[in-house]
Every structure is written in C-alpha cells, then in structure tokens.
C-alpha cells in the first residue's frame, strides 16, 4: 500500500487550530452515530474547505477513530500540497474510470488511523465520473471499514459535483469565509446541497478576523435553521 506523508508545515498549522477542530469533531459526534460519511463543501474556491476537511480528519484520527479522507475535488485539488507520496500513486479518478482497484487508491499516512484517497489526475469529465456506478460502489465497500469518512468536494456554488457526492453521504458541512460570501449565496448553497437528500449538519465560519471576533463566534456550529432577526 502506498504511503503519504503529511508535510510538517501542515501539521504545525493543524496543531494551532487543534482545539477548534476538536470542538467541531465533538459536535459532529453529538449530531448522531449515523453521521459517519460527511461531505465538506463551500460556495466558492479559497474559503478553506480542503484545510477544514484535512484538519477534521486529523482530529478524528487523533481521537482514536479509524478515518478515511477522500479528495473528491478532482477539478482543482490542493491536497497534493498537504500530503506527499513516497512513490507512484493512483487516485479517485483512476478508480472511477475503471483503471484501478479500490485497494490501489487507499493510502496509509504517517498519522495513525488516518488513511487518504488522493484525487488522481484531472479527468475530462469529472461530473460524469461521479455519476457512474463506481462511486456508490466505493462508498458501500468502505462504509463499514472506517469509523468516519470525510469527503472534500468541489465548491457547490461553481459545479454540481458536491451535491452528487452528498447524495451518497450521511450529512454535509458548509464552509464559508467570514466577510466574503453574502448570506443569500450561502443559503442557496445550503438548499442545493439539501436537494441531494443529505442532512445539513452546520456551517463553519472560516478565516474570521480575530481583531473583531472571538473564539465564541464559532459556537453556532451544528445549530440548524436558526431564526434570524
């Protein structure tokens, strides 16, 4: 099995936000034992969903849960800057196109209990690949092997891929950058994801300006459909 090493700078970054993601992990655990397969998305690129996916997966693994992180943002993966391969690797697109077995794409890491499925090469038809039978077949094959499966998806505000992926998940989390995305776009993204039939677990407000906000501003994670003034 191919091994991936998480780069030191990313580990240090994750350490700085460890308490924050431990709190998010706890909220997810309290949301229900049935919520094991989670899609992570955002409205636009650059809001921090991939970092959130990785940090959440790390938190789960470090808490003792056997965790699989799937990089399903096959159009614009940034995880190659987080995990470095010790050899030639195959990824999700190789499997979905029928050019690799499932066992070929699940990689061990230098973090105990954390395994990763890389995205693979950028395909000419990302949406069509996700809609074929291989994706659901993969989820069925692995869902009882891992305690949690975290799937980093493309931004729902740009392409429909995230909703397709979410249809095979127990729930989804929406990551949004503070001060960047208007509320109506966030609401629309939430509605698009809910059309998949997946359960909305909450919004993570990311990249908050600490000069005008405190740790307490993250406390609404997991609260759904709150009444707004």
UniProtKB/Swiss-Prot annotation:
Reaction catalysis annotation: L-tyrosyl-[protein] + ATP = O-phospho-L-tyrosyl-[protein] + ADP + H(+)
Top-tier EC class: transferase
GO cellular component terms given for this protein: plasma membrane
Keyword annotations from UniProtKB, A to Z: ATP-binding, Capsule biogenesis/degradation, Exopolysaccharide synthesis, Kinase, Nucleotide-binding, Phosphoprotein, Transferase, Tyrosine-protein kinase
Post-translational modification (record): Autophosphorylated.
Activity regulation details: Dephosphorylated and activated by CpsB.
Recorded metabolic or biological pathway in which this protein acts: Capsule biogenesis; capsule polysaccharide biosynthesis
Entry EC number(s): 2.7.10.2
One Gene Ontology biological process: capsule polysaccharide biosynthetic process
Pfam short name (any one): AAA_31
GO molecular function: ATP binding; non-membrane spanning protein tyrosine kinase activity
Function noted in UniProt: Involved in the regulation of capsular polysaccharide biosynthesis. Autophosphorylation of CpsD attenuates its activity and reduces the level of encapsulation. May be part of a complex that directs the coordinated polymerization and export to the cell surface of the capsular polysaccharide.
Family: Belongs to the CpsD/CapB family.
Name of the protein in question: Tyrosine-protein kinase CpsD
């Amino acid at each position: 099995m191919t091994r991936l090493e998480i780069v030191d700078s990313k580990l240090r970054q994750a350490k700085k936000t460890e308490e924050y993601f431990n709190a998010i992990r706890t909220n997810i655990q309290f949301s229900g034992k049935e919520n094991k397969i989670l899609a992570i998305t955002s409205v636009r690129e650059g809001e921090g969903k991939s970092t959130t996916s990785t940090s959440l997966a790390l938190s789960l693994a470090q808490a003792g849960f056997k965790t699989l992180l799937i990089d399903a943002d096959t159009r614009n993966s940034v995880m190659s800057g987080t995990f470095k391969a010790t050899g030639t690797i195959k990824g999700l697109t190789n499997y979905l196109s029928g050019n690799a077995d499932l066992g070929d794409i699940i990689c061990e890491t230098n973090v105990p209990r954390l395994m990763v499925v890389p995205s693979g090469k950028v395909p000419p038809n990302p949406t069509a690949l996700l809609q074929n039978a291989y994706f659901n077949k993969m989820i069925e094959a692995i869902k009882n092997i891992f305690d949690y499966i975290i799937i980093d998806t493309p931004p729902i505000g740009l392409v429909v891929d995230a909703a397709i992926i979410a249809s095979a998940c127990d729930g989804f989390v929406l990551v949004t950058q503070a001060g960047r995305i208007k509320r109506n776009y966030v609401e629309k993204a939430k509605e698009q994801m809910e059309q998949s039939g997946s359960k909305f677990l909450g919004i993570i407000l990311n990249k908050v300006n600490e000069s005008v906000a405190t740790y307490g501003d993250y406390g609404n994670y997991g609260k759904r459909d709150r009444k707004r003034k």
